[in-house]
Regions:
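Conserved beta-strand elements of the Class I
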Residues: 7, 120-122, 219
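His/Asp/Glu-rich metal-coordinating catalytic cores
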Residues: 52-210, 215
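C-terminal functional module detector
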Residues: 210-238
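Residue-level signal for beta-strand positions within conserved beta-sheet cores that form or flank
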Residues: 2, 117, 227-229
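Glycine-rich phosphate-binding loop signature in dinucleotide/nucleotide-binding domains
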Residues: 34-38, 69, 142-145, 220, ...
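A general secondary-structure boundary signal
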Residues: 45, 61-64, 192, 220-224
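N-terminal active-site segment of His-dependent metallophosphoesterases
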Residues: 1-63, 135
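Generic beta-strand hydrophobic packing signal
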Residues: 42, 182, 231-234
Length: 238
């Protein structure tokens, strides 16, 4: 298997009413940083957009930034940008989406393969944010020759968390997952929820819960055929 570098982010919330220009600068910094880090692919794990009513200008900005970056970008819809009949991803600006943009759009889960990288990316697009939606249900078995990276947008239940939550992810599900790396979204802060042999991380919002104006935070995951999978928080200048 090839050695890969993956930039993992989530919860960019483009189109928010709070500091919209800062959100754009942060998004641009993520893509520029991925290029500088020589990443092979960028993962955006849900809540790319703040809501389904964002202006077309915001969607056009997103599409243009992906096109300019010219690096594979995989998007998983989350609870703020659900993938259904009226999804933001069906709107006109996406009719001109660049070939390096990949959207996981199957509510039952799908694989997007990158043969040149030896990489399979899997995820379930969220149709509704309810306790019945299980973000990593149906994850496939990996093939011998490819890395399998899974994307999931939902709430991880620590052992003492017994409340009923929407889009739940449980420790035993992570421990028994078939993927090499589980890229998570939904939480604003970066959290390591690895379990067993599976590396699993929330990237957190790029601007963080405290909304800094100077840097963005992402996860840099490295998949190495000899040493295995590592992941660490990485700060990029805005």
């Amino acid at each position: 298997m090839k050695n890969l570098k993956i930039v993992h982010t989530s919860d960019t919330h483009l189109g928010t009413d709070w500091k919209p220009e800062l959100e754009k600068k942060a998004f641009r910094a993520i893509l520029n940083g991925a290029i500088d880090l020589d990443a092979d692919v960028v993962l955006i794990v849900g809540d790319v957009f703040d809501h389904a009513r964002v202006a077309d200008e915001v969607l056009q900005f997103f599409v243009q930034q992906i096109r300019t970056a010219n690096i594979p970008v995989v998007v998983l819809p989350g609870n703020h940008d659900l993938y259904g009949e009226h999804s933001v991803y069906h709107r006109e600006p996406f009719n001109d989406a660049p070939p390096n943009l990949y959207i996981l759009s199957d509510n039952d889960g799908e694989i997007i393969s990158f043969p040149e990288l030896g990489l399979d990316v899997w995820g379930r697009a969220m149709l509704s944010h309810t306790p019945q939606f299980q973000p990593i249900l149906g994850m496939p078995v990996k093939t011998a020759d490819n890395w399998l990276v899974a994307l999931a947008h939902g709430h991880y239940h620590f052992e003492n968390d017994t409340e009923v939550r929407s889009s739940p992810i449980y420790p035993d599900e992570v421990a028994n997952a078939t993927c090499d790396y589980l890229a998570l979204g939904h939480w604003e802060r970066q959290v390591d929820v690895s379990n067993g042999r599976v590396k699993a991380f929330y990237s957190g919002s790029p601007l963080g819960a405290l909304q800094t104006n100077e840097n963005v935070s992402v996860i840099m995951a490295e998949l190495n055929a000899t040493t295995g999978v590592t992941a660490q928080q990485c700060w990029l200048p805005i």
